[in-house]
């Protein structure tokens, strides 16, 4: 087993501070803790990606963790904007939401979400999803991966 030495760059998009903190704490269990950026809604996420991220010449996030139901701009709209943008479309997006409604799940996958996890989340399942996404997308992961 090989462990990368580069920390993941993760963008958490969630209007609930308690949920965002829980997600951040779950990420901290990685071999190399990630660089985490948090924003409270979809509009802030797109502003961040365009100002701080790809368009500013800074490395794009390795992973976006996205809530669906937020003020100003919800997760569905953010996901659509990300997937329509040639500079952002390759970033894996995991939907993390309290909704287990079939239309939300199907809609997220139809919008090309990389994964869908309901909150409250099982930490082992969350870690497995993050590891799998890093293997699948070829990111230099901070979590253990097989060589």
For each predicted feature, which ranges?
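Active-site residues of response regulator receiver
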Residues: 67, 97
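Negatively charged, flexible loop motifs adjacent to catalytic sites
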Residues: 87, 99-103
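Short, glycine/charged-rich "phosphate-handling" switch motifs in NTP-dependent
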Residues: 114
């Amino acid at each position: 087993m090989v462990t990368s030495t580069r920390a993941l760059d993760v963008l958490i998009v969630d209007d609930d501070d308690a949920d965002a903190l829980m997600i951040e704490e779950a990420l901290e269990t990685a071999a190399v803790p990630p660089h985490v950026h948090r924003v409270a809604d979809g509009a802030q996420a797109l502003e961040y990606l365009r100002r701080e991220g790809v368009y500013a010449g800074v490395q794009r996030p390795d992973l976006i963790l996205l809530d669906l139901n937020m003020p100003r701009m919800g997760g569905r709209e953010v996901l659509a904007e990300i997937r329509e943008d040639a500079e952002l479309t390759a970033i894996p997006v995991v939907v993390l939401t309290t909704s287990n409604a079939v239309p939300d799940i199907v809609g997220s996958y139809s919008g090309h979400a990389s994964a869908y996890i309901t909150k409250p989340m099982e930490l082992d399942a969350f870690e497995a999803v993050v590891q799998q996404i890093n293997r699948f997308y070829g990111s230099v992961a901070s979590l253990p991966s097989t060589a």
